[in-house]
Swiss-Prot record:
One of its GO terms (cellular component) is plasma membrane. This is Spermidine export protein MdtI. Coiled coil: none annotated. Belongs to the drug/metabolite transporter (DMT) superfamily. Small multidrug resistance (SMR) (TC 2.A.7.1) family. MdtI subfamily. It is found in: Cell inner membrane. The keyword Protein transport does not apply. The chain crosses the membrane at residues 6-26, 35-55, 64-84, 88-108. The keyword rRNA-binding does not apply.
Length: 109
């Protein structure tokens, strides 16, 4: 594995952003009834995995995947709240807190 450099982190950030975009587009596609939004969602997922593949060249897979998934979920929750007026119940908030705590623990290990 190469040494961690800025561009590995940049690819990880890009992967998170593309995952969030994919999730938003998927919601907006209304179950692929709006085909072009569904196709854009799939292309965003492809881009996210491509960026993640570049990120893991310098970041351990377990760390990169945990950060990608965790930040993606947290940001998707925020986007759902802002764009679609979706709210978490208390169990959802507990799950999100546990997820974020788990990301911190993986990063510190």
């Amino acid at each position: 594995m190469q040494q961690l450099e800025f561009y590995h982190i940049a690819f990880l950030i890009l992967a998170v952003i593309l995952e969030i975009i994919a999730n938003i587009l998927l919601k907006m596609s209304d179950g692929f009834r709006r085909v072009w939004l569904g196709i854009l969602s799939l292309l965003s997922v492809l881009g996210a995995f491509s960026a993640l593949a570049q990120a893991v060249k310098g970041i351990e897979l377990s760390v990169a995947y945990a950060l990608w998934g965790g930040f993606g979920i947290a940001a998707t929750v925020a986007a759902g709240w802002i764009l679609f007026n979706q709210r978490l119940n208390y169990k959802g908030w507990i799950g999100l807190i546990l997820l974020l705590a788990g990301m911190v623990m993986i990063k510190l290990s």
